[in-house]
Amino acid sequence: MNSGQTVGLLVLATLLTGCGTSPPRSPENICEIFREKSDWYDAAQVTQRRWGVPIQVPFAIMYQESGYRYDAKTPRKYLLWVIPWGRVSTAAGYAQAKDEVWSDYQKSTGRNWAHREDFDDAIDFVGWYMDKTTSINGVYKYDAYNQYLNYHEGWGGFRNKTYASKAWLMPTARKVQSRSDLYAQQYAGCKEDLNRGFWSRFWHWL
């Protein structure tokens, strides 16, 4: 293998690595998530400024949707219980965004290069969706319960209360609200430390 091929493979590996990373080791604690993955904290702050959403709600939604797995997909469907026949839906990535709404996001924001497997893009998508939910259905951005119902059922589905016929969905939305509340409490206790920057935190730990 010549030097040009080696460089090419290294560049390709870097690009692939950048698209998605392993889930955080402590997904139950947002402070530990940010300490492990400082780039996720940077992305969360960008999303907060761009869309006016509280940091804890997009994270609570993504925890529920994918468990922070960049390659998460819906279960497969089977023909005659044996032959793989596509998937239950086109939802994919950290945010479990479906093809159609992801395309709407790209067109609306001009982010045509965005990928569902990239965390920065995924959290920006959730922030965009939450902002639209507030505009369309008047749901407060801190209201993780109703934000999640909109996220799951779509804006029209929420208005038509399609969630009422799904006995499992409202308890799931309550879990998202509870996780959002927990994340908010945790973040309040570590925000100052996180905002000090790497070297300030390093000397603080000594």
How does the language model describe each region?
Residues 9-12, 90:
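A generic structural signal for short, non-catalytic loop/turn and secondary-structure boundary residues
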Residues 20-194:
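Catalytic glycan-binding domains that act on GlcNAc-containing polysaccharides
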Residues 192-206:
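Low-complexity, Gly/Ser/Thr/Pro-rich intrinsically disordered linker/tail segments
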Residues 12-13, 24:
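Residue-level signal for mature regions of secreted extracellular proteins and peptides
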Residues 15-18:
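C-terminal motif of bacterial Sec signal peptides marking the signal peptidase cleavage site
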Residues 1-8:
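Bacterial N-terminal signal peptides that target proteins for export
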